[in-house]
């Protein structure tokens, strides 16, 4: 069965001060976090990769990773496509002065024409570990419609400051009922807290790793039209169409059911510039422990 890895990379270069964080090597061989995600997705069974980028970064993106990945993928019978997120690709007029991208919902819609199979969607600059890819792949190939990898909160915190996480509420069958966005979660001696309130570090959180089907894209497209009519007029410069928010609305309305698949892997991201060294050390340890080979793709 064909399945797609959809990588949201259109935000590249926009959130990191010096240098482009998504293209920062994390090991001595020059691999970036995206290499590891692609490796883990192919290892799990995904056989189509779609990069969502901006047209203005296409050249640099292909030089740093795209062309290299394309040749690795072709050696493993994995196809590669590009989709371009464009601020003008909207069901209405662009508000005067708007420069902010429209968010993850619009990013995924940009790939609508190249997604014909069940797919997993991830952030380009996050490391998710192998388990989530395997769990989502198994769920999708066995006929599941919508799922989300649930990470254990304590495995997603930063030593360098507070983070925002979507804490998941579920019913007794492990179906998502609500994602509660919780800001400024910091590590403490006993666990974690957000603005002085203790947070359960064993809660499951959403890190934007969703398993979905092409049918969802039609729903997402209709939602974008509605968002444009209802949200944009009152907040033309800042309104964003975000996947977790939209899915949360569908859950509330009983129009969607999402299975939460727990993963025990540690999530790594570069929220703060200081996180870079810690992330590199984590990869060094995984390589030393044999989780990955130095010649990354040689074990596929």
Task: Annotate each predicted stretch with a short phrase.
Residues 1-28, 44:
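Glycine-rich N-terminal loop/short-helix segment of MobA-like nucleotidyltransferase
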Residues 1-7, 31-121, 128:
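Conserved N-terminal catalytic core of the sugar/cofactor nucleotidyltransferase
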Residues 13, 127-129:
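A short, conserved beta-strand element in the Rossmann-like catalytic core
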Residues 61-65, 136, 220, 279:
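Hydrophobic packing residues within well-ordered alpha-helices of enzyme cores
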Residues 130-210, 214:
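Conserved core of the sugar-phosphate nucleotidyltransferase
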Residues 204, 258-265:
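Catalytic beta-strand/loop signature of glycosyltransferases that borders the donor
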Residues 221-256:
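A C-terminal functional module that forms or caps the active site or interfaces directly
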């Amino acid at each position: 069965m064909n399945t797609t890895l959809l990588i949201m990379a259109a935000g590249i270069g926009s959130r990191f001060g010096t240098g482009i964080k998504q293209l920062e090597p994390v090991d001595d061989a020059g691999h970036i976090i995206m290499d590891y995600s692609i490796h883990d997705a192919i290892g799990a069974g995904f056989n189509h990769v779609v990069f969502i980028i901006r047209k203005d970064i296409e050249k640099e993106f292909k030089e740093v990773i795209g062309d290299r990945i394309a040749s690795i993928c072709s050696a493993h019978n994995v196809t590669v496509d590009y989709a371009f997120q464009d601020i003008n690709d909207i069901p209405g007029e662009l508000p005067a002065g708007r420069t902010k991208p429209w968010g993850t919902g619009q990013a995924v819609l940009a790939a609508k024409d190249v997604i014909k199979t069940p797919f997993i969607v991830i952030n380009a600059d996050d490391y998710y570990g192998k388990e989530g890819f395997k769990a989502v792949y198994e769920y999708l190939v066995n006929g599941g419609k919508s799922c989300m990898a649930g990470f254990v909160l304590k495995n997603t915190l930063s030593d360098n400051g507070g983070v925002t996480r979507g804490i998941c509420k579920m019913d007794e069958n492990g179906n998502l009922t609500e994602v509660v966005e919780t800001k400024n979660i910091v590590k403490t001696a006993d666990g974690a807290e957000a603005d002085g309130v203790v947070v359960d570090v064993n809660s499951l959180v959403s890190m934007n790793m969703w398993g979905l089907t092409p049918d969802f894209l039609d729903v997402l497209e209709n939602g974008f039209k509605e968002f444009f009519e209802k949200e944009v007029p009152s907040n033309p410069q800042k309104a964003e169409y975000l996947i977790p928010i939209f899915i949360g609305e569908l859950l509330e309305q009983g129009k969607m059911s999402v299975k939460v698949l727990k993963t025990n892997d540690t999530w790594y991201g570069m929220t703060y510039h200081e996180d870079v060294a810690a992330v590199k050390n984590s990869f060094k340890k995984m390589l030393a422990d044999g989780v990955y080979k130095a010649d990354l793709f040689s074990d596929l």
